[in-house]
């Protein structure tokens, strides 16, 4: 069947033209009943189109023609792969150029216009998120500042409340320590008051002092052993006071406890005499011989330099040795009879002084 007719027009086009002509003839015949109104073909076509079209579509068609009529587009549903590719590109750059958008459109099988609009929306979403984060940070800073300002005003009240129990604790602890010290000091004062009184009497009665020294000499060996066994920490005044066994023995034997103070005075006189003579000789090595039957009171086996032997430290060592003495040794020593006379006790004192001076690095007394 031949579709092309005269002058190259198809049969379909000819049929449409004939149909339009027939419509025009029918309209002309109907218009004869209304002599003042003669509608044109353009008016008829607009009247026909007004039934199914809006006024905006008619204006757009009048401006741009039927091809540029606004078409409604459905919302684009992005797949997971498309969104992943778009997000990766957005992390690299927020403003992709035309070449990057075209490549991304080819990879995601999307039109380039859709990619451009997606990036515009994504940038708007990113800015909105940044603004919300900034608001949250500002709010947190304000909260922190307010909490710091409140914390600066509140802690002094808490500190005052906390310092009250601390002071109570510190007062309670020294009170306990003071009670212990008072007990021990009372025992010491009871044990030392008698020696001081007796030393004053001994200055008047030196003969009784010498006889008392002869009686006390056998118990010195036990005292030296107790001094060796005592730890260095026990030399402190607080720890040295904790000697319950010594207080009872000291209270019972007053004549025995008076020996450290009297010997201390003798040693001080000896040191003053040696300082006056200025005969200080330092021995490089000192060999201790066999100890005599009556070693010098207060003599330590561990030799210390002369500079370290001060009066206070020596008095502390004597008082410590006085407290370390136990009651059985005191009772045993007090029960021993006095066998030596006054002359032997003086010679023994001189011998002990010579031994002590040699141990300290001092020259001996002139005979």
Curated annotation (Swiss-Prot):
GO molecular function, one term: DNA-binding transcription factor activity, RNA polymerase II-specific
Amino acid composition bias (Basic and acidic residues), ranges on this chain: 133-153, 203-218
Highest taxon of the lineage: Eukaryota
Signal peptide residues on this chain, from the entry's feature table: none
Residue stretches of biased makeup (Polar residues): 159-192, 233-254
Any Pfam family: OAR
InterPro entries for this protein: DMBX_homeobox (IPR052488), HD (IPR001356), Homeobox_CS (IPR017970), Homeodomain-like_sf (IPR009057), OAR_dom (IPR003654)
Sequence motif OAR, location on chain: 344-357
Region described as Disordered: spans on this chain: 129-254
Cellular compartments annotated: Nucleus
DNA-binding residues: 71-130
Expression sites (tissue/organ): In the embryo, expressed in the developing central nervous system and in other tissues including the developing digestive system. At 9.7 dpc, expression is restricted to the midbrain and pretectum.
One cellular component (GO) term of this entry: nucleus
One annotated GO biological process: regulation of transcription by RNA polymerase II
Keywords: Developmental protein, DNA-binding, Homeobox, Nucleus, Repressor, Transcription, Transcription regulation
Family: Belongs to the paired homeobox family.
Assembly description: Homodimer.
Function noted in UniProt: Functions as a transcriptional repressor. Required for brain development.
This protein's name: Diencephalon/mesencephalon homeobox protein 1
Organism name: Gallus gallus (Chicken)
């Amino acid at each position: 069947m031949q579709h092309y007719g005269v002058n190259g027009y198809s049969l379909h086009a000819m049929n449409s033209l004939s149909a339009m002509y027939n419509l025009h003839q029918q309209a002309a015949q109907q218009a004869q009943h209304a002599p003042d109104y003669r509608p044109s073909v353009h008016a008829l076509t607009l009247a026909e189109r007004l039934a199914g079209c809006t006024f905006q579509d008619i204006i757009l068609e009048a401006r741009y023609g039927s091809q540029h009529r606004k078409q409604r587009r459905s919302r684009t549903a992005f797949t997971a792969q498309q969104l992943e590719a778009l997000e990766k590109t957005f992390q690299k750059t927020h403003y992709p150029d035309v070449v990057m958008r075209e490549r991304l459109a080819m990879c995601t099988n999307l039109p380039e216009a859709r990619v451009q609009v997606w990036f515009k929306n994504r940038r708007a979403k990113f800015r909105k998120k940044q603004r919300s984060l900034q608001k949250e940070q500002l709010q947190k800073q304000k909260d922190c500042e307010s909490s710091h300002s409140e914390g600066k005003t509140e802690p002094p009240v808490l500190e005052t409340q906390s310092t009250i129990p601390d002071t109570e604790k510190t007062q309670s602890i020294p009170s306990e320590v003071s009670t212990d010290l008072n007990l021990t000091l009372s025992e010491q004062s009871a044990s030392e008051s008698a020696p001081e009184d007796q030393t004053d009497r001994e200055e008047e009665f030196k003969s009784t002092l010498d006889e008392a020294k002869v009686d006390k000499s056998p118990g010195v060996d036990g005292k030296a052993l107790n001094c060796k066994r005592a730890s260095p920490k026990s030399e402190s005044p607080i720890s040295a006071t904790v000697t319950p066994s010594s207080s009872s023995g000291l209270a019972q034997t007053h004549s025995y406890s008076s020996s450290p103070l009297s010997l201390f005075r003798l040693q001080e006189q000896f040191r003053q005499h040696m300082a006056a003579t200025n005969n200080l000789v330092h021995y490089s090595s000192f060999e201790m011989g066999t100890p005599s039957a009556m070693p010098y009171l207060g003599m330590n086996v561990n030799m210390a330099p002369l500079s370290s032997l001060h009066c206070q430290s020596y008095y502390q060592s004597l008082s410590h040795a006085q407290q370390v003495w136990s009651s059985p040794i005191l009772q045993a020593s007090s029960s021993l009879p006095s066998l030596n006379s006054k002359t032997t006790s003086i010679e023994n004192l001189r011998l002990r002084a010579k031994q002590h001076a040699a141990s300290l690095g001092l020259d001996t007394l002139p005979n």
